[in-house]
């Protein structure tokens, strides 16, 4: 299976880069998945969680909003704010707290934010 290249960048610098099997993005019209060979597109992203599937694990990045450029072999994400939540990390609890704060500050829509926060808490 061919791998997809992905990069997640915020104004302060790069949050994540790598080769992945798939990625699920929080689009403004709903979540959508991207695999190698996807059609080209540029889309707006809403507050949510980017789900990244690598060869051997799933990783998560919370974003407040941003843009994604998708080509058949890569995904480039420019976000206003992002927190990489590493599954097995000493600062995981701190990352989850920062992700919750980022998402709470991103939207006044409490219902939408609460569903994303529930997703983060289940990681």
Swiss-Prot record:
Recorded GO CC terms: plasma membrane; proton-transporting ATP synthase complex
Record bears the keyword Protein biosynthesis: no
GO molecular function annotation: ATP binding; proton-transporting ATP synthase activity, rotational mechanism
Domain of life: Bacteria
Major localization class: membrane
Subcellular location as annotated: Cell inner membrane
Alphabetical list of Gene3D superfamilies matching this protein: F0F1 ATP synthase delta/epsilon subunit, N-terminal
Cross-referenced InterPro entries: ATP_synth_F1_dsu/esu, ATP_synth_F1_dsu/esu_N, ATPsynth_dsu/esu_N
Membrane topology: Peripheral membrane protein
Gene Ontology terms describing biological process: proton motive force-driven ATP synthesis
UniProt cross-references to SUPFAM superfamilies, sorted A to Z: Epsilon subunit of F1F0-ATP synthase N-terminal domain
One Pfam family it belongs to: ATP-synt_DE_N
Keywords in alphabetical order: ATP synthesis, Cell inner membrane, Cell membrane, CF(1), Hydrogen ion transport, Ion transport, Membrane, Transport
Role this protein plays: Produces ATP from ADP in the presence of a proton gradient across the membrane.
Family named by the database record: Belongs to the ATPase epsilon chain family.
NCBIfam families: ATP_synt_epsi
Subunit: F-type ATPases have 2 components, CF(1) - the catalytic core - and CF(0) - the membrane proton channel. CF(1) has five subunits: alpha(3), beta(3), gamma(1), delta(1), epsilon(1). CF(0) has three main subunits: a, b and c.
The protein's name: ATP synthase epsilon chain
